[in-house]
């Protein structure tokens, strides 16, 4: 199963899937 979530760091957001 793949989980995708949004990661925000220092004003920069990206999508992370594991």
Swiss-Prot record:
Gene Ontology CC, one term: extracellular region
Distribution of this protein across tissues and organs: Hemocytes.
Cellular compartment(s): Secreted
Disulfide bond among keywords: yes
UniProt keyword annotations, A-Z: Amidation, Antibiotic, Antimicrobial, Disulfide bond, Secreted
Disulfide bonds: 4-17, 8-13
Biological process, per Gene Ontology: defense response to bacterium
Modified residues (Arginine amide): 18
Main location: secreted
Coiled-coil segments: none
Family to which the UniProt record says this protein belongs: Belongs to the tachyplesin/polyphemusin family.
Protein name, entry field: Polyphemusin-1
Originating organism: Limulus polyphemus
